[in-house]
Amino acid sequence: MSKVSQPRFHLAFPVTDLEQARSFYCDVIGCSAGRESDRWIDFDFFGHQLVAHLVDPADHPFAATNAVDGHAVPASHFGVILDWSQHEIFVARLKAAAVEFVIKPYLRFEGRKGEQVTLFVRDPSNNYLEFKAFRDIEMLFDKDIDNY
């Protein structure tokens, strides 16, 4: 039995069409597909395991939003934190694929110690994803919200 050197995150989420999910996560986001059945597909999402489970569209949850920095941020979302330079490359990849941004790439908390770039997209099943990068990754879990 092999040891896992770094814990891996696992997330299972609903999709309404597996082939659309495969196209979005592999061709647009850059994931590779792993195991699959006629009801689910595993994706390697930046080294973490996503599992897209096929559901009836009527059973897919509605996403509520929360106001953050003047934007209606989907309360239910997932994503990854990239290096600053990787984020710029990733934005270019999304633009080249003509992905519609739910929240266009922008600089949040500009000039403050928590400065970050962020964007939101939606997959074909209306699952929301956030991709962001911190100017200083040490601020990821900083508790000083007043000076963030």
Predicted regions and their residues:
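N-terminal beta-strand motif that seeds the catalytic metal site of vicinal oxygen chelate
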Residues: 1-20, 77-78, 82, 133-148
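Short, flexible, solvent-exposed loop/turn segments with mixed acidic/basic and small polar residues
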Residues: 1-2, 66-70
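A generic structural signal for short beta-strands and their flanking turns/coil linkers
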Residues: 7, 39, 48, 74-76, ...
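Core segments of cupin and vicinal oxygen chelate
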Residues: 13-59, 146
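Vicinal oxygen chelate
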Residues: 18-19, 73-125
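Conserved catalytic-core motifs of GNAT/GCN5-like acyltransferases
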Residues: 32-38, 106-109, 133-138
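A short, acidic/glycine-rich surface segment
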Residues: 59-66, 104, 108-112, 139-140
